[in-house]
Amino acid sequence: MKTVGQVMKSPVVTAKAGDTLADLVTLSRQRHMGHFPVVEGDKVIGIITDRSLREASTHPAVYNLLLDLLASLDRGLVEQIMIRDVITAPPETPVVDAVKLMREHRIGCLPVVKDGKLVGIVTASDLLWDLAAQEGQRQG
């Protein structure tokens, strides 16, 4: 049975709590990514998703900045909108269990953590691509 460790992406593009939202939006566009674990050293302390960024304008901390009409994203920080209760998985987690976990928590990615350190990330898209590749091998 395939595990998360076999499907995950590594190294992981991460954010720090003190990064500006403007920097993160730029990084998201450059890398075509929508999930950024927020780390302190190697430890995951939060996560920013494309949904977090879309909803940032309604978050009180960022909304107040938007009212100022002054480069609000340059002054808003990742830590103001990051999700702090991060659902993670160890590399040996079976893919089927990862899918169940993502569905149960209605999340689109799982940071992969080993011994408390971030080692990779797996997204719903990664799992779908892997499933499609497996199906193609079976048929072909």
PLM feature spans:
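Tandem CBS (Bateman) regulatory domains
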Residues: 1-11, 49-87, 99-103, 123-140
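Context-gated lysine
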Residues: 2, 9, 16, 43, ...
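The conserved cystathionine-beta-synthase
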Residues: 15-32, 38-40, 88-106, 113, ...
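A glycine-centered beta-loop-beta connector
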Residues: 28, 36-52, 102, 110-125
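Short, charge-rich amphipathic segments
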Residues: 29-37, 56-59, 63
